Amino acid sequence: RDLRMSRGLGDVYKRQGYEYVFEMDADFSHNPQDLPRLYRACSEEGADVAIGSRYVSGVNVVNWPMGRVLMSYFASKYVRFITGLPIHDTTAGFVCYRRRVLETINLDGIRFKGYAFQIEMKFTAYKCGFKVKEVPVIFINRELGTSKMNSSIFGEAVFGVIRLKWNSWFHKYPTVDKEMK
């Protein structure tokens, strides 16, 4: 993910005035029929961030090689352990954000570029006091194209998560206005 593109998209999302912003893979690994469930988690169940989770109720991944499943699953366990983030699928890219989450988070301050971008967004939302909820989904591997996973993305996630936690001890996160909730 190009950092400039991510920042630019954040600005576009905020300017459009939508109350809810969805992020999903365009290759249909994320089922569009699950969008209403993520929406309801935010609009009716009080979540500020709803995550389409592959791991909240077991492992729900179809057609991934076993090595990829294990790497993804244990990466999320690692992130939970290091950060204390109460999320089972920390790298999920199927997410519904309330507008106020994107308005509160300093999107220019998001540093991760690869899959770790997902971790940093969720961690920052959590540290700001937003309610994060996981919604079980089934993730189906793409039929066309290839993964962007490489050693630099992997290294960013492994070492970046430690740096993210370390920096959180010294960083003052904006807090959610209780009246907004």
Predicted regions and their residues:
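Acceptor/aglycone-binding surface of glycosyltransferases and processive sugar-polymer synthases
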Residues: 7-22, 32-115, 142-159
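Catalytic donor-sugar/metal-binding loop of nucleotide-sugar-dependent glycosyltransferases
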Residues: 86, 109-113, 122-139
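Short, hydrophobic secondary-structure boundary micro-motifs
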Residues: 50, 89-90, 134, 170, ...
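Terminal low-complexity segments of carbohydrate-biosynthetic enzymes
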Residues: 33, 44, 100-101, 129, ...
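The conserved acidic donor/metal-binding loop of glycosyltransferases
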Residues: 25-29
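DNA-recognition element of transcription regulators
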Residues: 119
